[in-house]
Amino acid sequence: MLNSSGVRTQRRSPRPLSLGGRKIITPTKFAYDHHNPDKVLDFVEMDCLEPKTKNNLTGKLLLVASLLILAIIVISQSSSFTSPSAFSQREEGVTHVLVTGGAGYIGSHAALRLLRDSYRVTIVDNLSRGNLGAVKTLQQLFPQTGRLQFIYADLGDPLAVEKIFSENAFDAVMHFAAVAYVGESTLYPLKYYHNITSNTLGVLEAMARHKVKKLIYSSTCATYGEPEKMPITEDTPQVPINPYGKAKKMAEDMILDFSKNSDMAVMILRYFNVIGSDPGGRLGEAPRPELREQGRISGACFDAARGFIPGLQVKGTDYKTSDGTCIRDYIDVTDLVDAHVKALEKAQPRKVGIYNVGTGKGRSVKEFVEACKKATGVEIKVDFLPRRPGDYAEVYSDPTKILKDLNWTARFTNLQDSLQVAWRWQKIHPHGYNSY
């Protein structure tokens, strides 16, 4: 057959081709020059797909579709596509409190009380001194959505602090986060100025930027130093004698200076020596093992009673007191937390309240040890050593002002009873929250 160009076409019979050891039939159409029959001018293979190739294409399409669906799911669950959480928006009738240091001894007890009183609580803690076990206990007690959230963060990180405040709608801040050992502060003063003074400044700045209007600041009687006159009132001159007290006073000064031109409601609570634990047995004091030497006298008594240490070391027997040992005002943690909640309830815009939180009664270290022996039922061995640097002889409060203004008074004032409550938790949790 000829066409106008003098080229003829010829259809050849299908020929087998081998691909990977398999033969398939591929019909082929060739074009010849009729002047030169042996010359192939062109060829066109006809469409033909191996069944396995079709299956591979289908599989790829399904894979692409699956990945597309997965991407849609991930995007839809991202923060920009989900509805705001309860913590990120204000709700009428609900007060959202940021509790810094809320995994610590006092902070966790405060969080428990706030949650029990139907506050919404966000705990921020870097766990350098706090216990994740305390947070888990609170989460188990209050599992409902929108009640409690925990954020692992360091207040010394300004980006983290800004993120926390920008993503949450706080109504108030209870600022407990700090390092709080007098002896340690004399060894590592810069750590104390950073963690107490500098971090408080960061929190205060974030509150100002995000218009959080209430601050309850956890301060200390250590800001008074060693006053010449007892008891200590809120007007007693503040002359701290160790870096812990100095760092706290500097933080107080910053807050007071800021409040002069702010509508923020501020409460500063200067409290004394904290003991005890939750009467319900849910929380307790559990310092890290490496910090036990720096810890409170109650912790040392309990360690001695359990045989974790050979005995109790009392540092200083030559103070100008009745028995030569330091005199302190021991406040039960349950009473202390109650004072914080009352301060939160009574805080007023453009006003500052400063209060001592104590029982108004001083007890010597020797008295404390005897009470601890009775509470534990163990005859604790006591070694008397030289004074600890930075300590002071006698400190106890005059709680008249807090009674008058906030209608607060200490209820758990029996030293032995408070120690018995704490001892019950210690016996069940000999290794702290790791005992679960």
From Swiss-Prot:
Residues 1-60 are cytoplasmic. NAD(+) binds at residues 96-127. The chain crosses the membrane at residues 61-81. Residues 1-20 are annotated as: Disordered. It is an enzyme of class 5 (isomerase). NCBIfam families: galE. Residues 82-436 are lumenal. The keyword rRNA processing does not apply. GO terms for molecular function: UDP-arabinose 4-epimerase activity; UDP-glucose 4-epimerase activity. GO terms for biological process: capsule polysaccharide biosynthetic process; galactose metabolic process; UDP-L-arabinose biosynthetic process. It catalyses: UDP-beta-L-arabinopyranose = UDP-alpha-D-xylose. It is a single-pass type II membrane protein. Keywords: Carbohydrate metabolism, Golgi apparatus, Isomerase, Membrane, NAD, Signal-anchor, Transmembrane, Transmembrane helix. Its EC number is 5.1.3.5. Its main location: Golgi. The active site is at residue 244. GO terms for cellular component: Golgi cisterna membrane. The keyword Phosphoprotein does not apply. Pathway: Nucleotide-sugar biosynthesis; UDP-L-arabinose biosynthesis; UDP-L-arabinose from UDP-alpha-D-xylose: step 1/1; Cell wall biogenesis; cell wall polysaccharide biosynthesis. InterPro entries: NAD(P)-bd_dom, NAD(P)-bd_dom_sf, UDP_G4E. It comes from Arabidopsis thaliana (Mouse-ear cress). This is Putative UDP-arabinose 4-epimerase 4. Its cofactor is NAD(+). Belongs to the NAD(P)-dependent epimerase/dehydratase family. It comes from the Eukaryota. It is found in: Golgi apparatus, Golgi stack membrane. Gene3D superfamilies: NAD(P)-binding Rossmann-like Domain, UDP-galactose 4-epimerase, domain 1.
